[in-house]
Regions:
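N-terminal auxiliary segments of SAM/dcSAM-dependent transferases
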Residues: 1-18
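Short, flexible segments with low predicted structural confidence
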Residues: 18-20, 30, 45, 69-70
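Conserved alpha-helix/loop element of class I SAM-dependent methyltransferases that forms part
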Residues: 20, 37-55
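Conserved adenylate-forming
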Residues: 23-24
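A short, structure-level motif marking secondary-structure boundaries and short turns
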Residues: 28-30, 55, 79-81
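Class I SAM-dependent methyltransferase Rossmann-like catalytic core
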Residues: 28-38
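Class I SAM-dependent methyltransferase SAM/SAH-binding core
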Residues: 58-116
Length: 117
């Protein structure tokens, strides 16, 4: 089931602000483009605080989309995050964006269904 189309819009938006396709990024530079939920990183920060997520934590994000929350958690809290996404195109782009942010050691992207993971 494909819920989101045009996942490459993130790359288009990054180009529009002067970022080349292979240029290194920070997780915060992606924030305006990769949060596919309400309230952006503010809601993620609240969840991190309430769940007491830290560098010692391991987090499973189900329905990770483009990986925005996973990268934000890894970058700000230092936690290890497994980002599980059903859509192959979103998962592939999320993995590339995470690599550009040098967070691949903290964030592991997996394409799969949470019912069988």
């Amino acid at each position: 089931m494909k819920l989101y189309c045009h996942v490459d819009r993130v790359l288009t938006e990054l180009r529009a602000v002067g970022k080349d396709d292979d240029e290194p990024l920070s997780a915060s530079e992606l924030t305006p483009f990769d949060q596919l939920h309400y309230h952006g990183t503010e809601s993620v920060d609240l969840a991190v605080e309430r769940a007491k997520i830290s560098a010692d934590s391991s987090v499973l994000e189900i329905g990770s989309g483009l990986g925005g929350p996973a990268r934000h958690i890894a970058a700000t809290a230092g936690a290890r995050v497994t980002a599980l996404e059903l859509q192959r195109d979103q998962n592939a782009l999320a993995s590339k964006l995470t690599a550009r942010c040098a967070l691949s050691e903290k964030v592991k992207h997996i394409c799969g269904d949470f019912l069988t993971y």
